[in-house]
Amino acid sequence: MASAGHIITLLLWGYLLELWTGGHTADTTHPRLRLSHKELLNLNRTSIFHSPFGFLDLHTMLLDEYQERLFVGGRDLVYSLSLERISDGYKEIHWPSTALKMEECIMKGKDAGECANYVRVLHHYNRTHLLTCGTGAFDPVCAFIRVGYHLEDPLFHLESPRSERGRGRCPFDPSSSFISTLIGSELFAGLYSDYWSRDAAIFRSMGRLAHIRTEHDDERLLKEPKFVGSYMIPDNEDRDDNKVYFFFTEKALEAENNAHAIYTRVGRLCVNDVGGQRILVNKWSTFLKARLVCSVPGMNGIDTYFDELEDVFLLPTRDHKNPVIFGLFNTTSNIFRGHAICVYHMSSIRAAFNGPYAHKEGPEYHWSVYEGKVPYPRPGSCASKVNGGRYGTTKDYPDDAIRFARSHPLMYQAIKPAHKKPILVKTDGKYNLKQIAVDRVEAEDGQYDVLFIGTDNGIVLKVITIYNQEMESMEEVILEELQIFKDPVPIISMEISSKRQQLYIGSASAVAQVRFHHCDMYGSACADCCLARDPYCAWDGISCSRYYPTGTHAKRRFRRQDVRHGNAAQQCFGQQFVGDALDKTEEHLAYGIENNSTLLECTPRSLQAKVIWFVQKGRETRKEEVKTDDRVVKMDLGLLFLRLHKSDAGTYFCQTVEHSFVHTVRKITLEVVEEEKVEDMFNKDDEEDRHHRMPCPAQSSISQGAKPWYKEFLQLIGYSNFQRVEEYCEKVWCTDRKRKKLKMSPSKWKYANPQEKKLRSKPEHYRLPRHTLDS
């Protein structure tokens, strides 16, 4: 079995790699830009809110564009933060459990940390109030928060100190899976409704309609579910036909060969469902569910499934009846770990619910299509008298229709994604994907969905996917990797504001906001901007700036952008370096000692670019590609000579290739000093003569106590005579003949660009640079 599993693993990995990376001209599996938490702060692109009490324990967030506030529910507290800058002008409500409740909770065997009031529900009840519910030390409670009608209204307080019971509206356990949505005055919630988290159910409470729930202990409806998301999506203009969709995972009864199989489901029920008259009294009579599939097609019809839903995002469109559903999945397989994002259209979801029902004749039978007569009205349909409907309420439904709905909640057809495959697959295991938010953007060459994906280590990935209809393939382009939080904490909630172009990100310890884009980070040239393929950004003839579609804030007609292909050569005609134009690149000077190691630094801004080194020897005009071997190694930081030969002297060109665009990042002239001459020079010099003969004082420009980064590097490669190297470098720096030449072209130990020095903090000035800027 082990060998068979190993073979399957190899086949899966090989197929995935071929499918998702083959044929790409650029390495789009890496982000084009990687920005640290510190860099985001320095760019003023992010703002962080920390609780003044030292703890937050965030569990829910609510975005209010009208009030321009972000409401945050944590442990014993509700915060109101400014959407403009969340770290400024916050308000808070302290809402702890009573001492008696906390004591009772601890006496029942719960930890003291669990016996607090964790806020799990925040919904707009009306223009002036929020509905909020908390776990209440394992005794759920609900209340209303007064927020005021106008933006200038400073109100933010609990409407009454007296709280209502929250059972069926909020879970007992702060860590239990839970979803809810407020429709009118009715709260729909999927949760575990008991103290021990055993009774999983979907509830409707509050409002004018009767309180209602799924049946107790019926595994055909829910079997150990994990609730992920819920939305009200209308089918048509008839409000009586409105339905609520629940997204969850559960143990699958129909997976007969695998008793532990986990499937993702879409559950659906009617908003106006009031249960049956004699059967399913005060129980849902319209509840149906279907399997939601996200899989990579495989050979011989064997798919690789991503069965466990992590997060779901509903992207509104101009047609409010047909939003686009984005699902973030992971695998439950023991063979390999991976994540995928699939997209679903409402037409596919409705087709599954309008299709055949799944049926099992008995314990010894297999699941199959129900081929008998389906009663009228069709089970799962809503009660409505519009267009001649006969039933005004589900209590009027015939018993056989209610009985059929009770015994056949599962649809036979699974819901498959658009293009029959995921739009994104990640199997590198670098981090786990946890949250997703999507913004739809108009670009010069079409419409793109920008995915913001939160991970379990505080990072947000900004990604676009491009479908090639002719090849039936999907290209994923990771535009940016943003380290949102200083510490690698899981991202547990995200809210998006397309209006403000801001993403609001919640972790257990802090809340952050980050702008969608910072276009000038891509570079100051047309090619850099076009190669970025960021639909938010375009070259305006002067700089890389925010792109606006024609007619909306468009101040300049000169807009160059190519998101689909990233063809900078075509968009930026005349700027590509070819032939003798390479000689226009500014020259840098580097020295190396024969038989020692030397690094020629070159790190392009884009992590997706392929680096190629060329060398020009002596007076030759011909440039040859550098051949790497055991002695000459191409690294992420540049070209490393482990043992320098005199024949290595020459002019080296560091070129990047990205989507067929060739760009010279750096031109370095390497001079090799004979080892014997260096030894002779230092042997002749004693300490007194050295001070007399040096053209300038032998003072290191490095502050006392600081360790030059090149010493650490030399130590790594085995060179131990640091003093001689430092003395030699001091001579080079202090020679009048060299000073003038090196003023604009620093040696390899200096920064190539003064801007880079400004960007670094003082302790890092003499550390090994992580990257170099374009010349």
Swiss-Prot record:
Return the SUPFAM superfamilies for the record. Answer: Immunoglobulin, Plexin repeat, Sema domain
Extract the GO molecular function terms from the UniProt entry: chemorepellent activity; neuropilin binding; receptor ligand activity; semaphorin receptor binding
What are the disulphide bonds in this sequence?
C105-C115, C133-C142, C270-C382, C294-C342, C519-C537, C654-C729
Which controlled-vocabulary keywords does the entry list? Angiogenesis, Developmental protein, Differentiation, Disulfide bond, Glycoprotein, Immunoglobulin domain, Neurogenesis, Secreted, Signal
Q: Does Ribosomal protein appear among the keywords?
A: no
Supply one GO CC term from the record: plasma membrane
Subcellular location(s) per record: Secreted
Record-linked SMART domains: PSI, Sema
**Record: glycosylation sites:** N44, N126, N330, N595, N596
Which residues constitute the signal peptide according to the record? 1-25
Its function, per the record, reads: Plays an important role in signaling via the cell surface receptor PLXND1. Mediates reorganization of the actin cytoskeleton, leading to the retraction of cell projections. Promotes focal adhesion disassembly and inhibits adhesion of endothelial cells to the extracellular matrix. Regulates angiogenesis, both during embryogenesis and after birth. Can down-regulate sprouting angiogenesis. Required for normal vascular patterning during embryogenesis. Plays an important role in ensuring the specificity of synapse formation.
Note the subunit structure.
Answer: Interacts with PLXND1.
Record family assignment: Belongs to the semaphorin family.
Protein name stated in the entry: Semaphorin-3E
Q: Give the gene symbol.
A: SEMA3E
